[in-house]
């Protein structure tokens, strides 16, 4: 099976998993993501949430998110709640991002391997979650882990054909950053970002961002099918 077909199948499995969770726990929207070695989310799969809203989150609000995996890496937490105390301590995030997007409560599910967070699922709703529903999220976690186990294979480093700057840009693409955000964070021009991406596409034999993310998601055994 090609890397792209395998990635498409994995995405479908995860999307189905999100849909199943939404049937067990009524949701407004949900997001699945992998967590890289820097504890940053990447490879997002969205359920009932617009690309514009997601991009707004990435560009303006992600650093303010109190439920980021990095806040829970030294704990054993597998389900985290957006408690009233957290809302009060993170008023800007709650009032400027959550409420305008009709999100009044969030529950975060963390998927771990040997205690390290390797993936997560954000559950969002326009009404508060009950304690029973949060317990249900905790109870469904083993089933989620089993369902997506094969989708969470370990990755090797990017091919040596990429420069350090190109690998950095690929990492940002996988985290969902737009060209504009990449340019701003790396302090380079937008045209330079586009030039880097063209070179990356040529070296990795892909034609767009989606294929790039799919290919770099695959373990080395799958990646060699394209070399």
Swiss-Prot record:
PROSITE patterns: HTH_LUXR_1, HTH_LUXR_2
One example GO MF annotation: DNA binding
Disulfide bonds: none
Keywords: Activator, DNA-binding, Transcription, Transcription regulation
DNA-binding region, residue intervals: 179-198
BP GO annotations: regulation of DNA-templated transcription
Identification of the protein by name: Monoamine regulon transcriptional regulator
Organism expressing this protein natively: Klebsiella aerogenes (Enterobacter aerogenes)
Lineage of the species this protein comes from: Bacteria, Pseudomonadati, Pseudomonadota, Gammaproteobacteria, Enterobacterales
């Amino acid at each position: 099976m090609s890397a792209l077909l395998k990635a498409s199948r994995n995405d479908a499995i995860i999307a189905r998993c999100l849909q199943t969770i939404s049937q067990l726990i009524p949701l407004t929207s949900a997001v699945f993501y992998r967590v890289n070695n820097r504890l940053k989310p990447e490879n997002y799969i969205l359920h009932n949430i617009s690309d514009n809203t997601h991009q707004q989150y990435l560009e303006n609000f992600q650093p303010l998110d109190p439920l980021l995996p990095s806040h829970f890496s030294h704990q054993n937490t597998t389900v985290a709640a957006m408690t009233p105390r957290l809302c009060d301590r993170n008023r800007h995030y709650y009032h400027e991002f959550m409420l305008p997007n009709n999100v009044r409560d969030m529950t975060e599910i963390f998927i771990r391997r040997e205690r390290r967070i390797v993936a997560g699922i954000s559950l969002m709703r326009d009404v508060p979650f009950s304690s029973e529903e949060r317990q249900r999220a905790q109870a469904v976690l083993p089933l989620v882990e089993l369902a997506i186990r094969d989708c969470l294979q370990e990755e090797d480093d990017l091919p040596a054909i990429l420069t350090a700057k190109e690998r950095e840009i690929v990492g940002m693409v996988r985290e969902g950053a737009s060209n504009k955000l990449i340019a701003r964070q790396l302090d380079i021009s937008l045209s330079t970002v586009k030039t880097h991406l063209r070179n990356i596409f040529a070296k990795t034999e892909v034609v767009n961002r989606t294929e790039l993310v799919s290919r770099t998601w695959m373990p080395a055994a799958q990646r060699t099918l394209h070399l």
